[in-house]
């Protein structure tokens, strides 16, 4: 086998993530690497924390990007707050709620499942009923934007119910942050994580997280050691915390953090509300075009994500053949269904930098050709 310099094809990324990356972000990532404890880099870290607080709409001091993809953010929140023997209410309406359950059980806790059909939002009343029936539950976990189905749940209400029953609440905002409203402080979310590769329009590899004081108090007063050295918040905050003197914890992905900083600047320049409006408007245009092609959406309108549209594959249409046609003939990537939805839906993402009118037009043209 011969290896040579890799030159990737130019793709239009219209799947569930990653999204296309803004040229300014790519340019930022190509700048010279400096040390992860360099005073200039420490200054950049502070700016990233400031910009993430803006994006999460929070004043939480402990707000920073974990080194790793969104799944590492998920594990960071769970392994710090879950202890062996605990009961945790896990809301599942797709693949990623199921992943939360798996992590909870790996931590030696018992997952109490609050389930909804794939493609539906979590019913807050079902969570209420579960928490009423078992006062030993101390933590809830739920997905804001379920990437496997394109459905969004009302996490403000889920958090309110959680606190009513003296539970801390963990929220997954991997696909929602930057694309639809996420208001950490106003909604009283205790621990939240996201991902860099969705509406923040960065390459994969960083997972922004934020923890409020209630969550930090629970972590500091654990009966057992956090079951991960790398993700132990008691350790990592010596590097990402507020101290003027930073301690070595791990070597941060320096150039990736350059990119995240630039992406967050771009989002602030656009304005969060404008970003939310752009994603909503472009979603409406895409769905209008899909209907004209005779295609139907999978999620009902009031629960549908604007940044990720799931489309029912018509009877007799070969899922893989259509996706391959789009990729090979038009350089467009759309996503397949996962789990029980494999072969039944396509996932079309207008996410972050990929959410624009030109991409909508190109996607609809390509689908029209593929379905002839």
Place the predicted regions along the sequence by residue:
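A glycine-/small-polar-enriched, mobile loop at the entrance of the PLP active site in fold-type I
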Residues: 10-67, 71
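Active-site C-terminal subdomain of aminotransferase-like
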Residues: 20-21, 197-288
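Conserved PLP-binding catalytic core of the aspartate aminotransferase-like
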Residues: 296-329
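PLP-dependent enzyme catalytic core of the Aspartate aminotransferase-like
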Residues: 340, 344-372
């Amino acid at each position: 086998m011969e290896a040579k310099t890799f030159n990737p094809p130019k793709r239009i990324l219209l799947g569930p993530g990653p999204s296309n990356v803004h040229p300014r972000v790519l340019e930022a990532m190509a700048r010279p690497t400096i040390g992860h404890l360099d005073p200039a880099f420490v200054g950049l870290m502070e700016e990233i924390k400031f910009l993430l607080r803006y994006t999460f709409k929070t004043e939480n001091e402990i707000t920073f990007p974990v080194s790793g993809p969104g799944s590492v953010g998920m594990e960071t929140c769970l392994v710090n707050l879950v202890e062996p023997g605990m009961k945790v209410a896990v809301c599942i309406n797709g693949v990623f709620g199921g992943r939360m359950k798996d992590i909870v059980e790996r931590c030696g806790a018992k997952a109490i499942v609050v389930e909804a059909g794939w493609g539906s939002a979590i019913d807050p009343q079902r969570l209420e009923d579960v928490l009423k029936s078992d006062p030993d539950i101390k933590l809830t976990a739920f997905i804001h934007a379920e990437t496997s189905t394109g459905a969004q749940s009302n996490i403000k209400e889920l958090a309110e119910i959680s606190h009513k029953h003296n539970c801390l609440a963990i929220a997954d905002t991997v696909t929602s942050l930057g694309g639809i409203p996420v208001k950490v402080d106003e909604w009283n979310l205790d621990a939240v994580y996201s991902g860099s590769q969705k509406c923040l329009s960065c390459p994969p590899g960083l997972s922004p997280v934020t923890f409020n004081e209630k969550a930090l108090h629970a972590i500091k007063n654990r009966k057992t050691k956090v079951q991960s050295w790398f993700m132990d918040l008691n350790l990592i905050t010596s590097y990402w915390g507020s101290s003027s003197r930073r301690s070595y914890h791990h070597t941060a992905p320096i150039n990736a953090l350059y990119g995240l900083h630039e992406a967050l600047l771009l989002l602030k320049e656009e304005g969060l509300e404008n970003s939310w409006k752009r994603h909503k408007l472009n979603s409406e245009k895409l769905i209008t075009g899909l209907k004209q092609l005779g295609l139907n959406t999978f999620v009902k309108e009031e629960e549908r994500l604007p940044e990720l549209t799931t489309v029912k594959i018509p009877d007799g249409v070969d899922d893989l053949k259509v996706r391959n046609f789009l990729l090979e003939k038009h350089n467009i990537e759309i996503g397949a269904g996962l789990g029980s939805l494999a072969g039944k839906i396509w996932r079309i993402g207008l996410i972050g930098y990929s959410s624009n009118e030109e991409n909508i037009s190109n996607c609809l043209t390509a689908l029209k050709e593929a379905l002839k």
